[in-house]
């Protein structure tokens, strides 16, 4: 399917529930690179790159999140692969 990039905006009760750490763990399990961060509006933003099938798995996971999270909505934006990332990090 090819390499792609996806940007996610995850809304709901997603801060203070280990969402970023859980996202990092899931992304690494899937072999993805990129980052995850909290946003000032209470949402979490994810930018991930890798194979399209694995990115779709990450999107499905983000719609559930870790057990303490209550995901209300995930906005998805597909983008072109950049190759700018070498690991998956939690950032500011």
Swiss-Prot record:
Residues 5-92 form the Acylphosphatase-like domain. The keyword Hydrolase applies. Transmembrane segments: none annotated. This is Acylphosphatase. GO terms for molecular function: acylphosphatase activity. It is an enzyme of class 3 (hydrolase). Its EC number is 3.6.1.7. Pfam families: Acylphosphatase. Belongs to the acylphosphatase family. The active site is at residues 20, 38. SUPFAM superfamilies: Acylphosphatase/BLUF domain-like. Keywords: Hydrolase. It catalyses: an acyl phosphate + H2O = a carboxylate + phosphate + H(+). It comes from Sorangium cellulosum (strain So ce56).
